[in-house]
């Protein structure tokens, strides 16, 4: 994939999903004694204990989603799974000639429509969605007094025309809101391009989750949650999130798992455009095990152009699935290059 920095793309509304998940984790620690208040939106049988969230990070000007994340919360085990979908993923969801998943919001017109289309293509139920212009990210980080991130490499980038200047040294350091956003926007130095940026997001997400747990005050966390929801497009209600958290609090505890949707990047030999092609076999395995798959995967072939052999070859082969625990990320066991 191309390795560039587009200054208009404010990255990682994935912070939002971690905020919600951290609320749940905080509830693990605090173990409130209040009775569960169950809303209709989160009533599940034991077989339907998985709540799936779609989180979108949008560039308000262009309308493209540079961050697409699915997160599942299992209220039986307390486990949370976060799957990042690369922005260059091939996704034919409308009559538009633009066939990347990051353009689906523009093509379909809303987060709700995007959620429905992605739900049908993946074969899973998506219960909640949240789309956010990431200009609020710096305020979020400053609201928690910064986060400590192990920056994987020296990050130096200048674009005076866009008023973008990034100077971060490799190593563990505390980032305020401004520098955190710079960390998230950077991608020119990763050998693996956008996949490297996605892995760096995992460092950020884990650091933010850790910081929110350190705060440990559910009221303070909900205040940040309100800040986010007041600036986003969402169907998430506070009582729904609290209900999910209370369910998880009754478990013996849970873990957070991070993963990138399995597939491979490939350049079109016609247009020269880079795409990321999902592996059908690998996605089916992952969705079945962690996101409560309910329908067949990609019944309408939205994730592949069957007329392009190189795309179809990737789509039909098994690609590696790498899943990281929070501890592995904390211990620098993720190789970012």
Where are these regions (language model features)?
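Non-catalytic, solvent-exposed segments at the cell envelope interface
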Residues: 2-337
């Amino acid at each position: 994939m191309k390795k560039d920095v587009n200054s208009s793309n404010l990255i990682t509304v994935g912070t939002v999903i971690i905020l919600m998940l951290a609320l749940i984790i905080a509830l693990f620690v605090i173990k409130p004694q209040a009775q569960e208040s169950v809303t209709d939106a989160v009533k599940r049988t034991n077989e339907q204990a998985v709540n799936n969230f779609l989180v979108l990070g949008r560039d308000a000007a262009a309308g493209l989603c540079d961050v697409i994340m699915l997160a599942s919360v299992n209220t039986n085990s307390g486990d949370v799974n976060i799957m990042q979908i690369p922005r260059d993923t091939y996704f034919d969801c409308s009559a538009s000639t633009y066939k990347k998943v990051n353009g689906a919001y523009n093509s379909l017109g809303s987060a709700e429509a995007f959620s429905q289309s992605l739900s049908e293509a993946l074969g899973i139920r998506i219960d909640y969605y949240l789309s956010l212009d990431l200009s609020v990210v710096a305020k979020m980080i400053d609201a928690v007094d910064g986060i400590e991130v192990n920056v994987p490499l020296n990050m130096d980038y200048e674009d005076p025309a866009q008023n973008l200047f990034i100077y971060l040294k490799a190593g563990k350091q505390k980032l305020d809101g401004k520098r955190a956003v710079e960390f998230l926007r950077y991608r020119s130095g990763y050998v693996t391009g956008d996949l490297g940026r996605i892995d760096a997001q995992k460092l950020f997400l884990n650091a933010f989750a850790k910081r929110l747990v350190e705060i440990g005050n559910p009221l303070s966390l909900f205040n940040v949650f309100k800040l986010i929801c007041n600036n986003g497009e969402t169907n998430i209600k506070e009582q729904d999130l609290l209900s999910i958290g209370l369910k998880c609090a009754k478990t013996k505890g849970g873990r957070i798992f991070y993963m990138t949707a399995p597939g491979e990047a490939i350049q079109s030999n016609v247009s020269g455009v880079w795409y990321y092609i999902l592996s059908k076999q690998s996605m089916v395995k992952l969705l079945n095990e962690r996101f409560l798959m309910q329908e067949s995967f990609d019944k309408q072939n939205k994730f592949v152009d069957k007329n392009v052999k190189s795309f179809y070859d990737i789509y039909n082969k098994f690609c590696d699935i790498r899943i990281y625990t929070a501890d592995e990320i904390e211990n620098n066991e993720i190789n970012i290059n």
